[in-house]
Structure formats: C-alpha cells, structure tokens
Amino acid sequence: MVDLVGGLVVHARAGERDLYRPLAGSKLVDSAEPVAVVEALLALHPFRALYLADLDAIRGRGDHRPLLVELTTRFPELTIWVDAGIASEDRLRDLAALPGVRPVLGSESQADPRLLERAHALASERLVLSLDWRGEEPLDPAGLRERPELWPRDVIVMTLARVGTASGPDFARLDAVHRAAGSARRVWAAGGVRGLEDLERLWERGIAGALVATALHDGRLGRTELARLAESVA
C-alpha cells in the first residue's frame, strides 16, 4: 500500500487522514518520495501489484495523475490498483485508459450505485471495488455492501480504523464479505496486518491476499517472511 498526500508517501494510521505525515523511520527507505518508496518495495520482494490511494483526490484536493503516469512508465512490471475517489464516469474512463492501472471504486466515494453498474462496461475485468468501514460504521452511501450482485471479481474490505495500527485484520467482517462474495470473486484484506501469521490465517480462510504497508516498513514482514509466504501459497 502506498498512500499519497501532497506528492509524498504518508504513514496512514487509523483513517485519521488530517493527521497523516510523510513516511519516516522506515527500515526500507530513507525517503517519502513515491518513486524511491516503490523502488525499495520492489527491492524487498518482486511484488506484481501495488495499491495506491490518492488521498488528495479522495478528499477533493487535487490529484496525483502526473505521478501515476510516471509510476506506470517507470515500473511497467507492476499492476497499480488506484483509489482516487472515483465518483464519475469521466474519472473512471481517465484512469482505466492508463496502461497497467486497475481503477478502484471506493464505497465511501459512491453516492449512487448506478456508477458501479456502468463501471463493469467501462473497466471490464480491471475494475476493483473497495468496501470501506471506519470502525463499525460502513462508509457506503450507495449501499454497495448490500448489492453483491454488482460486485466485480476483486473486492477489498478496507477497515480504516485498523490501518497502520498492527491491531490485526477484521477476520469476522472478512468472513462475512467472503461468504457474500461467493466463489467467483476474490476478497482482499486491508487494515491491521501484523505479520506473516496474519497473512497465513487470511489465506487459510480463503482470502486472496492483503494490502500491507506498515508491517513492511517496520520490518515485521521482511524478505524471509515474504519468501515463505510466496512458497506456501504457490
């Protein structure tokens, strides 16, 4: 996971976005510059996908599109999942047109379920849905969590209160979404991952994977742990 504010990678914690500060103290990289952070992540492990949250765009304070174009050019081996507060067809088309980008529709940004209905035609198999919660409160004005028939193949369960806190994934909510999603969809965890044991437990429950940042930067998920995980799920 890479969270962007004002052109820099920030340390996301508990969904309190106004309190996020540029990344510091990472064991991987001594910089908050996005290119340097991505290079450090790829030096740690040959990740094939990167989740990027444009927090400026999500909050209506500009966006990082030029940086996104740079990242797709510099790292063509990566598929970049981008949550940029997509709330219109034009914005969805713009992101879907970028090579290597998978647009993420965050439920917190959706006021009308019809965009998700139309998004399947606009982004096809690249579309990702993020079902967002803050604590027990769903951030879902359009009620997408109650419309599994509209969900695309990949669904993120984003528990913002757990992001950056090392408090563990919300296994109960993940289980519920996984049941609702059915066997044709993949469910991804976001928020709270502490280390290898959590990732193994998620895999055993049928969760496809997890979005992780803090555990990578503080060293709890290092090269050895990632290699073990890759071997066990191969």
Regions found by a protein language model. Give the residues of each.
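Glycine-rich, proline-tolerant flexible connector loops at the mouths of alpha/beta enzymes
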Residues: A49-D63, V157-T165
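Conserved anion-binding
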Residues: V2-S26, D90-A166
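Catalytic cores of alpha/beta
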Residues: R74, T79-P103, A119, L144-L150, ...
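C-terminal helical cap(s) of enzyme catalytic domains, especially alpha/beta-barrels
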Residues: L115-L122, E200-A234
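A short, N-terminal amphipathic alpha-helix
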Residues: S31-R48
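Short acidic, glycine/proline-enriched helix-loop-strand junctions
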Residues: T73-L78, E125, A184-R185, R228-V233
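Charged helix-capping and loop-helix junction motifs
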Residues: G62-E70, L139-E146, S167-A176, A227
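A cross-family glycoside hydrolase active-site/sugar-binding cleft signature
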Residues: M1, Y51-A53, W81-G85, V104-G106, ...
